[in-house]
Amino acid sequence: MLLLLKQSELNDALKILKSQGVIAYPTESVFGLGCDPDCEAAIQKILLLKQRPAYKGLILIAASIEQLEKYADFSLLTAAQLTVIKKTWPGPITWIVPSQKNLSKLISGDFESVAVRVTAHPIVRQICLAFDKPIISTSANLSSLEAALSSQQVNKMFKSNTLLNLVIDAPVSGLSTPTQIFHASTGKRLR
């Protein structure tokens, strides 16, 4: 069964994303925290919410590879590397790829690369398609704690924290482990 947000729920999420807000949403394996990747104020809210240092960087999650081109420089990859990446998308595989030169350090951290994924989760795809760009994706948890697997766990973890504006009440896709991360240039699995 394809699970999608009602139009009113989608509109609420878009309104928050467009106004420097933070949403919590289901992904393939855990709940994620997301915001507009072009809004540094919103990214700062996520870092504060998670108590995560900026040097680590964040993931961008999208509905298509085209949505990621503003942030990731796929032209620096070989045709073979790009073919391997495209075979894994949409899906639960995140790739570390060269970043565009102007990418915010709040996204790339201390790296010249960016972590990107084209998701297969229908709700995240719906949000990214309607938003017409990717969103930040980082696990919904305080740094060093287990990631939330449900909207109830997100609400409990972040109770009255006003930095989190919306928790989407829908299930994760059911992967029992976090999504895998690979480095595009080496093919090495990092997680």
Swiss-Prot record:
SUPFAM superfamilies, A to Z: YrdC/RibB (SSF55821)
Please list the reactions this protein catalyses. L-threonine + hydrogencarbonate + ATP = L-threonylcarbamoyladenylate + diphosphate + H2O
Extract one GO BP annotation from the record.
Answer: regulation of translational fidelity
Q: Which residues form a coiled coil?
A: none
Please classify the protein's predominant subcellular localization into one broad category. Answer: cytoplasm
The keyword Transferase belongs to this UniProt entry's keyword annotation: yes
- EC id: 2.7.7.87
Annotated ranges, domain YrdC-like: 7-191
Q: Which domain of life is it from?
A: Bacteria
Q: Which UniProt keywords apply?
A: ATP-binding, Cytoplasm, Nucleotide-binding, Nucleotidyltransferase, Transferase, tRNA processing
Q: Which Pfam families match?
A: Sua5_yciO_yrdC (PF01300)
- Show the GO cellular component annotation of the record: cytoplasm
Q: Where in the cell is it found?
A: Cytoplasm
Q: Which InterPro entries does the UniProt record give?
A: DHBP_synth_RibB-like_a/b_dom (IPR017945), Sua5-like_dom (IPR006070), TC-AMP_synthase (IPR023535), TC-AMP_synthase_SUA5 (IPR050156)
Citing just one GO molecular function, the answer is: ATP binding
Q: Which family does it belong to?
A: Belongs to the SUA5 family. TsaC subfamily.
Free-text function comment from the UniProt entry: Required for the formation of a threonylcarbamoyl group on adenosine at position 37 (t(6)A37) in tRNAs that read codons beginning with adenine. Catalyzes the conversion of L-threonine, HCO(3)(-)/CO(2) and ATP to give threonylcarbamoyl-AMP (TC-AMP) as the acyladenylate intermediate, with the release of diphosphate.
* Listed name of the protein: Threonylcarbamoyl-AMP synthase
